[in-house]
């Protein structure tokens, strides 16, 4: 049997895969402080409220453009809590993104960039997948563009109990298991 040639599939998909930078800005929070040692011995011992400044945080991940008008699917944990989202396209253009919706229980998010005629990847029908069929994982692991790995469909209709990013128990139903390498940043 001839080996499977995935070069055309890889070439067709890399243009629709984007790099996402999600920035959470510094915030000031009021917290109840520990009782001051002198208050403990000599005062009322209640402590004082204090202002703390959180550090800005930046997260990275991948996404895929699913419509020519700029809708992108990514993981919720990539954009959760973000104040600013920057989307870098395969052609190195950077656009501002905004969150349209999130689902922490399935770790999915939909974001939008402004523009039109973006390259897309068609969404397939997972019911038509067969165990043992070849699949590609395309993303930007380690902040590197257009990384492609291959594997097979290992199982279908898997269910797993997990904890969503909001701390709630979640039961993800009917996901596809693959042995394609998924590295940090492929999310």
What is each stretch, according to the model?
Residues 1-187:
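Serine-dependent protease modules
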């Amino acid at each position: 049997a001839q080996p499977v040639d995935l070069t055309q599939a890889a070439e067709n998909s890399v243009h629709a895969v984007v790099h996402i930078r999600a920035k959470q800005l510094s915030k000031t929070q009021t917290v109840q402080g520990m009782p001051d040692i002198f208050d403990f011995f000599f005062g009322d011992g209640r402590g004082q409220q204090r202002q703390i400044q959180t550090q800005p945080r930046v997260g990275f991940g991948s996404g895929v453009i699913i419509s020519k008008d700029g809708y992108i699917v990514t993981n919720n944990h990539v954009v959760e809590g973000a104040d600013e989202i920057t989307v870098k396209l395969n052609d190195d253009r950077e656009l501002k993104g905004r969150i349209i919706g999130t689902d922490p229980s399935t770790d999915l998010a939909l974001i939008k960039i402004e523009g039109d005629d973006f390259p897309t990847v068609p969404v397939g029908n997972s019911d038509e997948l067969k165990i043992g069929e070849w699949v590609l994982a395309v993303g930007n692991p380690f902040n590197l563009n257009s990384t492609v790995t291959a594997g097979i469909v290992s199982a279908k209709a898997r269910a797993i109990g997990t904890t969503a990013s909001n701390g709630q128990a979640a039961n993800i139903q009917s996901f596809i298991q693959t042995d394609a390498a998924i590295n940090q940043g492929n999310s």
